[in-house]
């Protein structure tokens, strides 16, 4: 009964908004329609900027991994590369709503385009989030079980885990094609997605319980315990320094305290960014599916805030790795050296003089 009333209210609300804007669609952020160019300028700028950052950032990560063989010796690199490929595809997929904002007349089969786009980007974000959780588990095992880590985490098991992540992500959103509900608000740029494809409280709880909540809890649990271990190591080093203020302990403090402190700060940034970008989206997803809140502006902002995590991943997880930074620096030096050598070669090569009143091809 409440479901039917909510549907009727939304249809009436949308019909009244359509009457108000007459021939034009309303923009997602509610700033109205720009009738001069037939484009929602602000929304287009936001999506184009995010798309550029996501594609350029993850292309850099993938290129450095392929050009730096040392990175392949780290087990975390398997998940970082998988996450980079998934986030790169997120950026490429974001070109679809950009084109939709630039040209509202999408033609036939808008419902199919909306469903396919929503499904694909939901799967890619699921892979990215699952990789974040797997990276945290990998770091947790490396710190808590250092002696048996190489036996627990093998390349074969890592490949199987990555395959299972893709299969699980594809299956968990598949019921959206069978009328269970909308997997998210990524496709609400399309008119059909925003007005005709409604969310379902049961399907939302299904996704949150099987994907978002486990990933968030795993990240919180593992990094919290890693942070505790780092603090414990720092405390032990400080106690040893207080009891035995020798040169050996001073050297161990300089070699051990600073890395632990830096690692703890990296973990704090990782966890903070993860929750700041994903928690608003999850909360709004639950509230809107429960018919408590319906705000297109919040829907747009929380959705693209969560999608921006695809750019933050490549910045935090890659640039916090010292080996990756070394590979990036060497790659940059190689490219700069090749450019300088090419310019020097051009400067050294003698150029033939042109005769007056002559033509050269």
From Swiss-Prot:
InterPro entries attached to this UniProt entry: GPCR_Rhodpsn (IPR000276), GPCR_Rhodpsn_7TM (IPR017452), TAAR (IPR050569)
Keywords: Cell membrane, Disulfide bond, G-protein coupled receptor, Glycoprotein, Membrane, Receptor, Transducer, Transmembrane, Transmembrane helix
GO cellular component annotations of the record: plasma membrane
Keyword RNA-binding on entry: no
Topology class, membrane: Multi-pass membrane protein
Record-annotated membrane-spanning stretches: 45-65, 82-102, 116-136, 160-180, 206-226, 266-286, 297-317
Disulfide linkage: 114-193
GO terms classed as biological process: locomotory behavior; response to xenobiotic stimulus
Pfam families (alphabetical): 7tm_1 (PF00001)
Record topology, Extracellular segments: 1-44, 103-115, 181-205, 287-296
Compartments it resides in: Cell membrane
CDD domains associated with the record: 7tm_classA_rhodopsin-like
Tissue specificity of this protein: Expressed in brain, especially in striatum. Expressed in the striatum, nucleus accumbens, and lateral globus pallidus.
Coarse class of the protein's main subcellular location: membrane
Reported consequences of knocking out the gene: Gpr52 knockout mice are normal in body and brain weight. In the open field test, mice stay and move around the central zone significantly longer. The total distance traveled and brain morphology are normal. Mice are much more sensitive to the startle response following dizocilpine administration. Thus mice displayed psychosis-related behaviors. Mice exhibit a significantly higher istradefylline-induced locomotor activity.
GO molecular function, one term: G protein-coupled receptor activity
Cytoplasmic side: 66-81, 137-159, 227-265, 318-361
Superkingdom: Eukaryota
Annotated glycosylation sites: 2, 13, 20
Entry's family note: Belongs to the G-protein coupled receptor 1 family.
Functional summary from the UniProt entry: G- protein coupled receptor activated by antipsychotics reserpine leading to an increase in intracellular cAMP and its internalization. May play a role in locomotor activity through modulation of dopamine, NMDA and ADORA2A-induced locomotor activity. These behavioral changes are accompanied by modulation of the dopamine receptor signaling pathway in striatum. Modulates HTT level via cAMP-dependent but PKA independent mechanisms throught activation of RAB39B that translocates HTT to the endoplasmic reticulum, thus avoiding proteasome degradation.
Additional notes on this entry: GPR52 is located within an intron of RABGAP1L gene, which exhibits epistatic effects on GPR52-mediated modulation of HTT levels by blocking this modulation.
Record protein name field: G-protein coupled receptor 52
Organism this protein belongs to: Mus musculus
Lineage: Eukaryota, Metazoa, Chordata, Craniata, Vertebrata
Gene this chain is encoded by: Gpr52
């Amino acid at each position: 009964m409440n479901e039917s009333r909510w549907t009727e209210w939304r249809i009436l609300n949308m019909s009244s908004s359509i009457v108000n804007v007459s021939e034009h669609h309303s923009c997602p952020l509610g700033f109205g329609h720009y009738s001069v160019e037939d484009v929602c300028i602000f929304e287009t700028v936001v999506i184009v900027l995010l798309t550029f950052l996501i594609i350029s950032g993850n292309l850099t990560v993938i290129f450095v991994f392929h050009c730096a063989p040392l990175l392949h010796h780290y087990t975390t690199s398997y998940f970082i590369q998988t996450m980079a490929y998934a986030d790169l595809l997120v950026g490429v997929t974001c070109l679809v709503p950009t084109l939709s904002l630039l040209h509202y007349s999408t033609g036939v089969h808008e419902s199919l385009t909306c469903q396919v786009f929503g499904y694909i980007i939901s799967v890619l974000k699921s892979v990215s989030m699952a990789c974040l959780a797997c990276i945290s588990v990998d770091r947790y095992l490396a710190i808590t079980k250092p002696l048996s880590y190489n036996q627990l985490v093998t390349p074969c098991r890592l490949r199987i885990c990555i395959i299972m992540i893709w299969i699980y992500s594809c299956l968990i959103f598949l019921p959206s094609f069978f009328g269970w509900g909308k997997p998210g608000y990524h496709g609400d740029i399309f008119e059909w997605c925003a007005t005709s494809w409604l969310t379902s409280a049961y399907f939302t709880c299904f996704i949150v319980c099987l994907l978002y909540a486990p990933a968030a809890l795993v990240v919180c649990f593992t990094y919290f315990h890693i942070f505790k271990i780092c603090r414990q190591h720092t405390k032990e080093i400080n106690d040893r320094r207080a009891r035995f203020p020798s040169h050996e302990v001073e050297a161990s403090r300089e070699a051990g305290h600073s890395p632990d402190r830096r690692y703890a700060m990296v973990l704090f940034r990782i966890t903070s960014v993860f929750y700041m970008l994903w928690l608003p989206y999850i909360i709004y997803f639950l509230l809107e599916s429960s018919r408590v809140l319906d705000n297109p502006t919040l829907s747009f902002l929380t959705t693209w805030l969560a999608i921006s995590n695809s750019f933050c991943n490549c910045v935090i997880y890659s640039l916090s790795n010292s080996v990756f930074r070394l590979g990036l620096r060497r790659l940059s030096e190689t490219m700069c050296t090749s450019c300088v050598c090419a310019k020097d070669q051009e400067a050294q090569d003698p150029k033939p003089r042109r005769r007056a009143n002559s033509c050269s091809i």
